[in-house]
C-alpha cells in the first residue's frame, strides 16, 4: 500500500471505532484459518464486510474502508487485515493491490450499462486494464453483458444460497475480443442488500486460473 492508502486505512471509520480495530479483530479470527472461521467471526455492525474466496486459498473477510465518488459510479474500497485492497464499482472489480496478480487500474471509455437496463439480447461495453506484476498496460476487452436465466453451474456456499432466492437476478460478462489471453465468464448476482439494490455476489477472473468470488457478508441480512 502507498503511504496515503495506509493513512486512510488507519483513520477511516464507518462508525465510532477506527477501521484498524475491525481489521485487527478479523486478522486474529479469520485470516489463514479458512471457511469455519469466516462463518464464526464476530462482526461489528458498524462496518460492512465482503467475503472473498479464491481456489486453493482460505476464505477471507474484507472490510469496507470508504466509498470514493466517481462519475461512472461510486467505488467501494475494501481492505483485508493483511494488506490486500479491492476496489469495486457497480459490482465490477476496477483495481486490486497486494494480490498475486493485480489489476492495478480498469478504465471504461463509456459507462457500462446499469444492471437493470441490460436488455435480453445483452449489451456491449469496452474496458481497458493494467496488469501487474507482468507490467502489461492498456489491455483492451470487448465485453458482452447478458441476463442469465440461472446462476453458474459451479456450486459454492454463496451460489447455493442465492440459487434459492426468488429475487436474485443473474448476469454474466463474456469477453468476445481481447488484446490478451481470454478470461472465463464473470458472473454477477443482483439483489437487495441492506435495503439497497446491488451486486451481492460475483465471480470475476483476473486471469484464466486466478478467479475471485466476492460475497457481501453475512449473506443473511439479519445476521449482523
List PLM regions with ranges:
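Acidic, serine/threonine-rich low-complexity disordered tracts
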Residues: 13-88, 92-105, 117, 122-224
Amino acid at each position: 500500500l502507498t503511504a496515503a492508502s495506509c493513512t486512510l486505512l488507519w483513520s477511516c471509520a464507518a462508525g465510532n471505532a477506527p477501521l484498524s480495530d475491525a481489521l485487527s479483530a478479523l486478522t486474529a479470527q479469520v485470516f489463514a484459518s479458512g471457511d469455519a472461521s469466516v462463518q464464526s467471526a464476530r462482526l461489528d455492525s458498524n462496518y460492512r464486510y465482503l467475503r472473498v474466496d479464491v481456489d486453493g486459498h482460505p476464505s477471507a473477510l474484507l472490510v469496507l474502508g470508504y466509498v470514493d465518488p466517481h462519475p461512472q459510479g461510486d467505488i467501494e474500497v475494501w481492505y483485508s487485515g493483511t494488506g490486500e485492497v479491492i476496489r469495486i464499482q457497480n459490482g465490477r472489480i476496477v483495481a486490486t493491490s497486494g494480490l498475486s496478480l493485480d489489476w492495478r487500474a480498469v478504465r471504461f471509455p463509456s459507462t457500462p450499462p446499469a444492471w437493470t437496463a441490460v436488455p435480453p439480447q445483452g449489451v456491449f461495453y469496452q474496458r481497458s486494464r493494467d496488469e501487474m506484476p507482468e507490467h502489461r498496460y492498456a489491455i483492451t476487452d470487448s465485453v458482452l453483458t447478458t441476463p442469465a436465466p440461472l446462476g453458474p453451474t459451479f456450486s459454492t456456499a454463496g451460489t447455493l444460497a442465492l440459487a434459492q432466492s426468488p429475487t436474485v437476478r443473474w448476469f454474466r460478462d463474456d469477453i468476445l475480443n481481447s488484446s490478451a489471453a481470454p478470461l472465463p465468464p464473470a458472473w454477477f448476482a443482483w439483489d437487495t442488500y441492506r435495503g439497497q439494490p446491488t451486486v451481492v455476489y460475483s465471480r470475476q477472473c483476473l486471469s484464466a486460473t486466478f478467479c475471485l468470488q466476492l460475497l457481501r457478508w453475512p449473506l443473511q441480512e439479519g445476521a449482523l
